């Protein structure tokens, strides 16, 4: 018998971290919620990371997802910005792990391919397909829409991931 799995997708960012929650039952997806957690740019880095952690922890506590998916970050020419984004990504991995959730990471191209069918696409295409796949989905920011796309990607890939984890457990035990 299939079970409903609640998934949180997280799109890390230091200014805004998007989150999106979907429920997956077999091949059907249902929108649960989405939003952003923000940090105050006037504050020091440690305080901003704390704000992101507290905000994500509240979302996790409120919606009680079963699994989490986080997008890999890309490296750009600005090393300082890349490092700060990496630290925000660390928070995006830490918060669900602290809540006891299995966390899976996806490359941006994998997310695009899962949602629009190709690994290279525009944000508008992704946002449109999120609405096609889940007509009741609502999102106020691009970050929240991207987070929903990450959750959708995980819903599409999770069965093979679950099977691989079971196989590893059997081989280890």
From Swiss-Prot:
User: Could you say which residues form the signal peptide?
Assistant: none
**Keyword terms of this UniProt record:** Cytoplasm, DNA damage, DNA recombination, DNA repair, DNA-binding, Endonuclease, Hydrolase, Magnesium, Metal-binding, Nuclease
Task: Give the note describing cofactor binding and stoichiometry.
Answer: Binds 2 Mg(2+) ion per subunit.
Q: Which GO cellular component term is one of those annotated?
A: cytoplasm
Required cofactor names: Mg(2+)
List the catalytic activities from the record: Endonucleolytic cleavage at a junction such as a reciprocal single-stranded crossover between two homologous DNA duplexes (Holliday junction)
Q: What is its EC number?
A: 3.1.21.10
Keyword field contains Cytoplasm: yes
Q: What does this protein do?
A: The RuvA-RuvB-RuvC complex processes Holliday junction (HJ) DNA during genetic recombination and DNA repair. Endonuclease that resolves HJ intermediates. Cleaves cruciform DNA by making single-stranded nicks across the HJ at symmetrical positions within the homologous arms, yielding a 5'-phosphate and a 3'-hydroxyl group; requires a central core of homology in the junction. The consensus cleavage sequence is 5'-(A/T)TT(C/G)-3'. Cleavage occurs on the 3'-side of the TT dinucleotide at the point of strand exchange.
Q: What name does UniProt use for this protein?
A: Crossover junction endodeoxyribonuclease RuvC
Q: Which species is listed as the source?
A: Brucella suis (strain ATCC 23445 / NCTC 10510)
